[in-house]
UniProtKB/Swiss-Prot annotation:
Membrane topology value: Peripheral membrane protein
Name of the featured protein: Prostaglandin G/H synthase 1
Glycosylation: residue positions: 74, 110, 150, 416
Note: The conversion of arachidonate to prostaglandin H2 is a 2 step reaction: a cyclooxygenase (COX) reaction which converts arachidonate to prostaglandin G2 (PGG2) and a peroxidase reaction in which PGG2 is reduced to prostaglandin H2 (PGH2). The cyclooxygenase reaction occurs in a hydrophobic channel in the core of the enzyme. The peroxidase reaction occurs at a heme-containing active site located near the protein surface. The nonsteroidal anti-inflammatory drugs (NSAIDs) binding site corresponds to the cyclooxygenase active site. Conversion of arachidonate to prostaglandin H2 is mediated by 2 different isozymes: the constitutive PTGS1 and the inducible PTGS2. PTGS1 is expressed constitutively and generally produces prostanoids acutely in response to hormonal stimuli to fine-tune physiological processes requiring instantaneous, continuous regulation (e.g. hemostasis). PTGS2 is inducible and typically produces prostanoids that mediate responses to physiological stresses such as infection and inflammation.
Name of the coding gene: PTGS1
Free-text cofactor note: Binds 1 heme b (iron(II)-protoporphyrin IX) group per subunit.
Length: 606
């Protein structure tokens, strides 16, 4: 190999000499302890329109605007199609007004094919607001396999407020949030009972509690971010239990039926002596007086055990119908098919009567899974912690409970183990259907006996660092409120909230939902509808029985089972499982003459 020539060596030597003559670089010193640490830029929630904030280095960020329809540093520049769609989209306030007025127009729509078209639009637009597959949870504020696969977690729609933010709500508001007890007593505690202007009753209130406790089962051992309801939807775990062991204790293992006991000639859930499952009753209540059902807390309220009794009777009634239709089926097939039928009946009642009552719409809602078969839809659901918090509707509860001529206080009503049997199903259904429930929104309408529940919800939301109320409004396509006065629609409460929070952008999620001014003649405000409806509809229509693979007569034992679902109503649930047919509805009677004495009407195939 030839040596390098002297002419090439000279420039290298000169370069080394110059480097030696350069002054040394300044030493790397630790940061000044007195200098303020850089604020996590994601604490400002800079990314709009569902853009994802990614922190870069210490004080920089990037917004991932992929498939949002927007671009720019903060996902604020719409593309042409997004701009056009946003410009033409009517406001939620206008849509709500349209759906709750001009009755003659909606009577025409309900009688035509337009109804199905509108229902399909409502279902797809609402459901598309819920991320599927699920994204975040209590421990993962970024996309991860654990957040997707671990069903022990509640999912969450928005990631938590970063831990290193200047204030609990990001950068807005005060360094310390107001005391939860003070907040509840000043803004949520009832002064005078405010009835729901839509006429919602206690039959509705107890249905809401009974229905939602199948998928809202926060784990006391693991913490508020975890659930014991691993089905994450309408699986009727509150009827059959949330584990195979509990289910087996409740089953008769004959003709597909559930265990039961007969008291005064009527069928009720079995006692804990007959079905040894854990039920939460006060100490001193003997096992023979404890009724055993799928949800361990249903002994708390006679209204919950009332629905547990109705669904037990319905299960065993459907088993008899299937047994007559399929005499060769064994116990397991009868049980499993009946469970699917009851899931379908539940969803039908929820959409066409329960949600219908909540909405106040003149558009007649319809449960027909086939409406979605022509569009892209994911038949899977994960319950979100925001949905769990949103659904704490304790303002529904009255000051006392009226059954016949007797008025019961909370102390007399809670854990009353004899009321259901003493009065019977018909009398309680009639009483609960006639008593008004409270208005949910607008604030100051939670009875003091249940106010502690709202306090715990606020504390849990802080533990899980839920983003501010306005961030959730933006996430669900709503305009953020500019002031507390705009939120509440009045000045006194707005001034008090301003004093406690300091900034409307620091208002917490749950207080915002309950303190928002109600829509005209409505049970709650705009946000409860626009945020709650997507969770609800995605959970209902995302059920496997609504999929093309499941939604066929053979799944439900033929036309007999399929027709049970398609014709299910709240009235049928009650009147086909009682000796007489009481007044039953999700709203109080409109007039004294629209129903008659319960004992005069016998149950028939309605």
């Amino acid at each position: 190999m030839s040596r390098s020539s002297p002419s090439l060596r000279l420039p290298v030597l000169l370069l080394l000499l110059l480097l030696l003559l350069l002054p040394p670089p300044p030493p790397v010193l630790p940061a000044d302890p007195g200098a303020p640490a850089p604020v996590n830029p994601c604490c400002y929630f800079p990314c709009q329109h569902q853009g994802v904030c990614v922190r870069v280095a210490l004080d920089r960020y990037q917004c991932d605007c992929t498939r949002t329809g927007y671009s720019g540093p903060n996902c604020t520049v719409p593309d042409l199609w997004t701009w056009l769609r946003s410009s033409l989209r009517p406001s939620p306030t206008f849509v709500h007004y349209l759906l709750t007025h001009v009755r003659w127009f909606w009577e025409f729509v309900n009688a035509t094919f337009i109804r199905d078209t509108l229902m399909r639009l409502v279902l797809t637009v609402r459901s598309n607001l819920i991320p599927s597959p699920p994204t975040y949870n209590l421990d993962y504020d970024y996309i991860s396999w654990e957040a997707f696969s671990n069903v022990s977690y509640y999912t969450r729609v928005l990631p938590s407020v970063p831990k290193d933010c200047p204030t609990p709500m990001g950068t807005k508001g005060k360094k310390q949030l107001p005391d939860a007890q003070v907040l509840a007593h000043r803004f949520l505690l009832r002064r005078t009972f405010i009835p729901d202007p839509q006429g919602t009753n206690l039959m509705f209130a107890f249905f809401a509690q009974h229905f939602t406790h199948q998928f809202f089962k926060t784990s006391g051992k693991m913490g508020p971010g975890f659930t014991k309801a691993l089905g994450h939807g309408v699986d009727l775990g509150h009827i059959y239990g949330d584990s195979l062991e509990r289910q087996y204790h409740l089953r008769l293992f004959k003709d597909g039926k559930l265990k039961y006991q007969v008291l005064d000639g009527e069928v009720y859930p079995p006692s804990v002596e007959e079905a040894p499952v854990l039920m939460h009753y006060p100490r001193g209540v003997p096992p023979r007086s404890q009724m055993a059902v799928g949800q361990e807390v249903f002994g708390l309220l006679p209204g919950l055990m009332l629905y547990a009794t109705l669904w037990l009777r319905e299960h065993n009634r459907v088993c008899d119908l299937l047994k007559a239709e399929h005499p060769t089926w064994d116990d397991e097939q009868l049980f499993q098919t009946t469970r699917l039928i009851l899931i379908g009946e539940t969803i039908k009642i929820v959409i066409e009567e329960y949600v219908q009552q909540l909405s106040g719409y003149f558009l007649q809602l319809k449960f027909d899974p086939e409406m979605l078969f022509s569009v892209q839809f994911q038949y899977r659901n994960r319950i979100a912690m925001e949905f769990n918090h949103l659904y704490h509707w304790h303002p529904l509860m009255p000051d006392s409970f009226q059954v016949g001529s007797q008025e019961y206080s909370y102390e007399q009503f809670l854990f009353n183990t004899s009321m259901l049997v003493d009065y019977g199903v018909e009398a309680l259904v009639d009483a609960f259907s006639r008593q008004s429930a409270g208005r949910i929104g607008g604030g100051r309408n939670i009875d003091h006996h249940v106010l502690h529940v709202a306090v715990e919800v606020i504390k849990e939301s802080r533990e899980m660092r839920l983003q501010p109320f306005n961030e959730y409004r933006k996430r669900f396509g709503l305009k953020p409120y500019a002031s507390f006065q705009e939120l509440t629609g009045e000045t006194e409460m707005a001034a008090e909230l301003e004093e406690l929070y300091g900034d409307i952008d620091a208002l917490e999620f749950y207080p915002g939902l309950l303190l928002e001014k109600c829509q005209p003649n409505s049970i709650f405000g705009e946000s409860m509808i626009e945020i709650g409806a997507p969770f609800s509809l995605k959970g209902l229509l995302g059920n496997p029985i609504c999929s093309p693979e499941y939604w066929k007569p053979s799944t439900f034992g033929g036309e007999v089972g399929s027709n049970l679902i398609k014709t299910a109503t709240l009235k049928k649930l009650v009147c086909l499982n009682t000796k007489t047919c009481p007044y039953v509805s999700f709203r109080v009677p409109r007039s004294s003459g629209d129903d008659g004495p319960a004992a005069e009407r016998r149950s028939t195939e309605l």
